[in-house]
Amino acid sequence: MSNRRSKARTAALQGLYQWQLMGQDVDKIDIEFIVQDIRGIDHAYFQELLRGVPQRQGELDECLGPFLDRPINEVDPVECAILRIGAFELLCRPEIPYRVVLNEAIELAKRFGAEHGHRYVNGILDKVAQKVRATEFRSRALRRRLQT
């Protein structure tokens, strides 16, 4: 993935964190980022994540729920936002390979999450990916078997 898209994920994480903790309107958050004039990000992708995650929160939380070890509202807010971004990408952006989604989420968790938060994020999103990207998982496993 492009560095611009990685930066968009980082900005979306920050915006979604504000939205989750303070209930701030995503339009206001978007305006804040425009005013800050953050350069080098894929602004359209930032907006897609910033708006798409709240719009589909129920569906995303339902998708994540079976794999969480606690209710979603008890998950660390940073990891929660990362999990929701990852679930959104897995569900809504099938053109992005699941490995890219997982790697980007892990990097966000390493950078912004708790000490071992990246392991938690990886474990949850890996299970979500197996469920929602089953065909992609099977074809990857088949390719690995054929290579050995």
Swiss-Prot record:
<protein>
    <recommendedName>
        <fullName>Transcription antitermination protein NusB</fullName>
    </recommendedName>
</protein>
<keyword id="KW-0694">RNA-binding</keyword>
<keyword id="KW-0889">Transcription antitermination</keyword>
<dbReference type="GO" id="GO:0031564">
    <property type="term" value="P:transcription antitermination"/>
</dbReference>
<dbReference type="GO" id="GO:0005829">
    <property type="term" value="C:cytosol"/>
</dbReference>
<dbReference type="InterPro" id="IPR011605">
    <property type="entry name" value="NusB_fam"/>
</dbReference>
<dbReference type="InterPro" id="IPR035926">
    <property type="entry name" value="NusB-like_sf"/>
</dbReference>
<keyword id="KW-0804">Transcription</keyword>
<dbReference type="Pfam" id="PF01029">
    <property type="entry name" value="NusB"/>
</dbReference>
<dbReference type="GO" id="GO:0003723">
    <property type="term" value="F:RNA binding"/>
</dbReference>
<comment type="function">
    <text>Involved in transcription antitermination. Required for transcription of ribosomal RNA (rRNA) genes. Binds specifically to the boxA antiterminator sequence of the ribosomal RNA (rrn) operons.</text>
</comment>
<dbReference type="GO" id="GO:0006353">
    <property type="term" value="P:DNA-templated transcription termination"/>
</dbReference>
<dbReference type="InterPro" id="IPR006027">
    <property type="entry name" value="NusB_RsmB_TIM44"/>
</dbReference>
<keyword id="KW-0805">Transcription regulation</keyword>
<comment type="similarity">
    <text>Belongs to the NusB family.</text>
</comment>
